[in-house]
């Protein structure tokens, strides 16, 4: 039995992994460290240099950008400005302060700028402030304007040279083409058509002969024939090309690229050079140069970002050789979906590109200022305008598709969000254009991107998740680790291979049986070759072996026990639903885990980890103080009932005691969804698989009342309510307790400022913050103004605009934050005061809530039964959940059944000696002969408990307190009906399943409206819960009522309940007064129809039944007349006013 990291878990793993799971946040943190050139990055560089490795870039991201832009010269070349030695000062505020005060967690960036007068040689040097640069928190996130955000890594096509084959349907010929794609600059495309001529497209413009390009580069016909004469396609192309010499070719290219402009030789030469040979305009980037060199077998230096003449010639040669039928082993077309051709743009690179963009804009400003300012007076400070750089960075973090609002539903959701790979976004694919191939699982994804975890909707296959052991190399390609095999023996060496390096080798699986000396136990080994081909070969032909069975899946997928027994579609749902799990009141680690839980919880960053070994000196609910062994003391602050981005509750609690000895890296406090340092997303519940009176038909779930009473599945949700007092044209708004026309009992919980007290219970419509807004007053006459000046201010007319609890929300006030301009808080323009109220709500589980297992088995609670009515076991234990067995076979997620049985074994404990000799032999692999009740077990993915092991353990489970073994090797128990006490006629599968409560809570979805807001345009009720809208009675529903002949119900729905403006005011009055409902009037939509017909010059007259013409008036006239008759004051916004009713 392999030793598990968590000592409390007994593992069923047979394979001992030679490699620890790498830091799960390294994708984010290492990339950002490289960008800013942090100390951590400098240490990694030194370590790589010392060990002779080249897997760490030796120039930081910002340094690269400043080097690229330096020097900025004026148009005459007499002055230049260059940048060097960037540095950061410490951030002004901590992460917590930034979250509280709606600020960005950033540090001031300074750079040394040198202005050189090239005529005199004079140098002026200054340290220039380049703006506040957002910093990454230790958890791999950014705090932007007080909210936590994640920059998602982007999966893009790598720069380089790509060869493609397509079939011409008319001639049934293979046509070859090639694209040279730079990181930035013009594309160069070569193609051979069905007439065997070789063409070129420059910058996606019109096609022309490739020989024109060669002549423009200075080749004459003799030289072209000498190099390409053996290829018929090039000879045909040359014959059809009528350009004479270099000048003619250059002009021909210029005409194609700049039609309508008069060509000259010089401008044509400059154009061509700027397109491909000018580093300012064209850049392959290091990765592009690496790919071009690799494909075309060139030895050009990696820092040469422009194309060389040899690059172009070798590319043409390669494509014509492909067309001529060259040896496929040497010359092959590229697969664009292969991970050797797709790379990752990590956080650092994305921000670096944005800084580069800002500096390019700044460069233009600097050049202009150089020409306009006096040379003597110029200093770097006068030339530099940092606004474009600051704006560029701000724009990226605030609005980019890749800077996303962090998913903080639970720690796993946050961890997965940071490890996400997104093929969408700027420079990537679009949902509409992405076909099936790019979304599909590719053999090169193995160990790099998870084939399971991806969204179900239109983004399927475009958004993925990094595999557990994968890492990104300096070129942006994903690498995965393999154990080196030499002469049929597995060595201790571990090599990290990219997808195209891996294609050259033969790899064995991680579960291939090995002897103690590392040699293969069998004569034939199952291996994987290029393109995912599988075969058996002798051991001495094997090059590499997988490091772990779970290396192909992501973290979330690696947390599904018995994944190997689930259909991939259901495993996908299981992976995604774990991320929607709500933190419960009391977290409980799964009885059946995979051994991934502790590592995932630690790297997610929501637990508190001790930095150095020491002794716990002091602790409370809010902090833990550790005295380190070196004599230093550190206090760890704990987050208490903080709201997450999704409204779930973030709360940390200590799991150590005063005087405990703690080690470096030990978890000392649990966060949300963690139990004793392990990820704990749900609860272990006793489940029976049986139909129950049809109430669990179609995935519906039956639950025991015990789970409601004991708060087993209760969760805390925190909502933030905000109100601001602004300056209006009529005077400032005021936060006050003095609200007009409001009873004193309504204000009972408000303090003297008009803000609710902490601890108050609030329900819908209750005032949280009292606020009044000045009402418009008529212009005063001079006499009135004089009287007012003498006798003092008359009470101003104000209206109540207080912050109230929205419909459907309630709870307890747990926090109030007040920001005011007077206290020096930064507030938006025009805002004088801002109040935030936090309301916490305990939500018990209720019918309509969604529950799920980890195997894609999900359902909605249909009925909550009293515990005494639930089916019960022989010893009287009632089950917690009844699931429908029909949900298992066709969905093929058998993992849930195995989890049920193993969960029972873990809950009851086992003693193998109690089994027969036969079972003892089968269970030898487990290692733990006995386990007490409630023992947690780990069954790692693809290396977990086998069916015969579970069957054997079921036979060996410990008896209950009465000495009865309730469940035998079949895994089924005798159940009794809780209502009658009669036994069911058949045995039922019973056991423990880990059940998650998902964020799709019925309280957030259920909605009803009586009267509410109407659309300004159609005068019909708005739609949706957020707008407090109505339910749409659509076309098909109207047909249904028509079919039943329900004319009055239909008339009511189409008029007074919708857009008969006058009618609905009258109906409201009639209901209030208890009178009969009046006849409906004319709906607004009918008037719109008439207006549309009039706009088509059709004169429409509406006649009553007795032939009298009905006059169509504007709604405003109707409303005001009706309002006047009813005595409604339309100037006040109250529920009885027309705007609201």
Curated annotation (Swiss-Prot):
Quaternary assembly: The RNAP catalytic core consists of 2 alpha, 1 beta, 1 beta' and 1 omega subunit. When a sigma factor is associated with the core the holoenzyme is formed, which can initiate transcription.
Family per similarity comment: Belongs to the RNA polymerase beta chain family.
Pfam families per the UniProt record, alphabetical: RNA_pol_Rpb2_1 (PF04563), RNA_pol_Rpb2_2 (PF04561), RNA_pol_Rpb2_3 (PF04565), RNA_pol_Rpb2_45 (PF10385), RNA_pol_Rpb2_6 (PF00562), RNA_pol_Rpb2_7 (PF04560)
Protein name: DNA-directed RNA polymerase subunit beta
SUPFAM superfamilies (UniProt xref): beta and beta-prime subunits of DNA dependent RNA-polymerase (SSF64484)
UniProt EC number: 2.7.7.6
GO BP terms in the entry: DNA-templated transcription
Keywords assigned: DNA-directed RNA polymerase, Nucleotidyltransferase, Transcription, Transferase
């Amino acid at each position: 039995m392999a030793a598990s990291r968590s000592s409390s878990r007994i593992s069923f793993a047979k394979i001992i992994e030679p490699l620890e799971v790498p830091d799960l946040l390294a994708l984010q943190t290492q990339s950002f460290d490289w960008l800013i050139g942090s100390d951590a990055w400098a240490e990694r560089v030194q370590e790589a240099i010392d060990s002779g490795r080249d897997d760490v870039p030796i120039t930081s991201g910002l340094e690269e950008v400043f080097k690229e832009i330096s020097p900025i010269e004026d148009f005459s070349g007499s002055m230049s400005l260059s940048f060097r030695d960037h540095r950061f000062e410490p951030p002004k505020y901590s992460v917590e302060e930034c979250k509280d005060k709606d600020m960005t967690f950033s540090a001031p960036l300074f750079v040394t700028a040198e202005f050189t007068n090239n005529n005199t040689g004079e140098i002026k040097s200054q340290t220039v402030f380049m703006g506040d640069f957002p910093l990454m928190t230790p958890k791999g996130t950014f705090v932007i304007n007080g909210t936590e955000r994640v920059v998602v890594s982007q999966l893009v096509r790598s720069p380089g040279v790509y060869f493609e084959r397509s079939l011409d349907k008319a001639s049934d010929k293979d046509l070859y083409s090639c694209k040279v794609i730079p990181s930035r600059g013009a594309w160069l495309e070569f193609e051979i058509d069905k007439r065997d001529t070789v063409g070129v497209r420059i910058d996606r413009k019109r096609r022309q002969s490739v020989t024109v390009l060669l002549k423009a580069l200075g080749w004459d016909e003799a030289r072209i024939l000498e190099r390409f004469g053996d290829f018929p396609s090039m000879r045909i192309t040359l014959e059809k090309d009528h350009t004479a010499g270099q000048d003619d070719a250059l002009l021909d290219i210029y005409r194609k690229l700049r039609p309508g402009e008069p060509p000259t030789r010089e401008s044509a030469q400059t154009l061509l050079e700027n397109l491909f040979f000018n580093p300012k305009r064209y850049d392959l980037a290091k990765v592009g140069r690496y790919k071009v060199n690799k494909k075309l077998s060139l030895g050009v230096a990696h820092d040469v970002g422009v194309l060389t003449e040899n690059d172009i010639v070798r590319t043409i040669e390669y494509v014509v050789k492909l067309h001529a039928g060259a040896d496929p082993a040497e010359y092959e077309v590229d697969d664009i979906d292969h991970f050797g051709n797709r790379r990752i743009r990590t956080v650092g690179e994305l921000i670096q590109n944005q800084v580069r963009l800002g500096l390019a804009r700044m460069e233009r400003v600097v050049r202009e200022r150089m020409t306009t300012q006096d040379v003597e007076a110029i200093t770097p400070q006068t030339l530099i305008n940092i606004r474009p750089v600051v704006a560029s960075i701000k724009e990226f973090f605030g609005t980019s598709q890749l800077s996303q609002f962090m998913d903080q539903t639970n720690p796993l959701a946050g961890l997965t969000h940071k490890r996400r790979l997104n093929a969408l976004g700027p420079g990537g694919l679009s949902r509409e254009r992405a076909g099936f191939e790019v979304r599909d699982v590719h053999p090169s994804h193995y160990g790099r991107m998870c084939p399971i975890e991806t969204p179900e909707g239109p983004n399927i296959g475009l958004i993925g998740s990094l595999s557990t052991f994968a890492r990104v190399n300096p070129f942006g390609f994903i690498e995965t680790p393999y154990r080196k095999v030499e002469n049929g023996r597995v060595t201790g060496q571990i090599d990290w291979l990219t997808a195209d390096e891996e294609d050259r080798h033969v790899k064995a699986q991680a579960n291939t049986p090995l002897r103690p000396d590392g040699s293969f136990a069998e004569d034939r080994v199952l291996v994987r070759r290029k393109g995912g081909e599988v075969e058996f070969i002798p051991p001495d032909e094997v090059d590499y072996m997988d490091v772990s069975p779970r290396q192909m899946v992501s973290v979330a997928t690696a947390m599904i026990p018995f994944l190997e027994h689930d259909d991939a579609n259901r495993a996908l749902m299981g992976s995604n639903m774990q991320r929607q799990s709500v933190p419960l009141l009391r977290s409980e680690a799964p009885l059946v885990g995979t051994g991934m839980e502790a590592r995932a919880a630690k790297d997610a960053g929501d637990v508190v980890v001790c930095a150095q070994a020491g002794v716990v000196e002091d602790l409370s609910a809010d902090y833990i103080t550790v005295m380190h062994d070196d004599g230093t003391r550190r206090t760890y602050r704990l987050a208490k009932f903080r709201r997450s981005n999704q409204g779930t509750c973030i709360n940390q609690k200590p799991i150590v005691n005063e005087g405990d000895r703690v080690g470096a890296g030990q978890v000392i406090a649990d966060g949300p969804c963690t139990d004793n340092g392990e990820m704990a997303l749900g609860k272990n519940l006793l489940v029976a698989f049986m139909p129950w009176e049809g109430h669990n038909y179609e995935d519906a779930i039956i639950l025991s009342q015990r789970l409601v009473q004991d708060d087993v599945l209760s969760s805390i949700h925190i909502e933030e309510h905000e109100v601001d007092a602004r300056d209006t044209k009529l005077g400032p708004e005021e936060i006050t307790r003095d609200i007009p026309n409001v009873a004193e009992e309504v204000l009972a919980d408000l303090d003297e400022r008009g803000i609710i007290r902490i601890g108050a219970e609030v329900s819908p419509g209750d005032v949280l913050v009292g606020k009044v807004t000045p009402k418009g007053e008529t212009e005063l006459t001079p006499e009135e103004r004089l009287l007012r000046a003498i006798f003092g201010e008359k009470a101003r007319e104000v209206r109540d605009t207080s912050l109230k609890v929205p419909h459907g929300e309630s709870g307890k006030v747990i926090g109030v934050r007040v920001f005011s301009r007077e206290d020096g808080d930064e507030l938006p323009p025009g805002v004088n005061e801002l109040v935030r109220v936090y309301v916490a709500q305990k939500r018990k589980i209720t019918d309509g809530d969604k529950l799920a297992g980890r195997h894609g088995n999900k359902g909605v609670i249909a009925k909550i039964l009293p515990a005494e009515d639930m089916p019960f076991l022989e010893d009287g234990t009632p089950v917690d959940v009844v699931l429908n067995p029909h949900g298992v076979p066709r969905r093929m997620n058998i993992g849930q059944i195995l989890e049920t049985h193993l969960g029972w074994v873990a809950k009851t404990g086992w003693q193998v000696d109690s089994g027969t000799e036969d079972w003892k032999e089968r269970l030898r692999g487990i290692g733990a002969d006995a386990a007490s009740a409630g023992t947690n077990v780990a069954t790692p993915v693809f290396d977990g408990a086998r069916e015969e092991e579970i069957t054997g353990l079921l036979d060996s489970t410990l008896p209950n307190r009465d000495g009865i073994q309730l469940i035998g090797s079949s895994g089924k128990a005798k159940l009794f009906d809780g209502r009658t006490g009669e036994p069911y006629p058949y045995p039922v599968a019973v056991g423990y399943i880990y059940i998650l409560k998902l964020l799709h809570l019925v309280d957030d979805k259920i909605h009803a409206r009586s009267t509410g807001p109407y659309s300004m345009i159609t005068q019909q009720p708005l739609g949706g819960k957020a707008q407090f809208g109505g339910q749409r009675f659509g076309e098909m529903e109207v047909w249904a009522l028509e079919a039943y002949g329900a004319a009055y119900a239909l008339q009511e729905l189409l008029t007074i309940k919708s857009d008969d403006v006058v009618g609905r005011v009258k109906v409201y009055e009639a209901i209030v007064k208890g009178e009969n409902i009046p006849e409906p009037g004319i709906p607004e939509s009918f008037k719109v129809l008439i207006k549309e017909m009039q706009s088509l010059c059709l004169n429409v007259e509406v006649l009553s039944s007795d032939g009298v013409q009905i006059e169509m008036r504007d709604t405003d006239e109707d409303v005001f007349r009706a309002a006047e008759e009813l005595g409604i004051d339309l100037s006040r916004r109250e529920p009885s006013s027309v705007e609201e009713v």
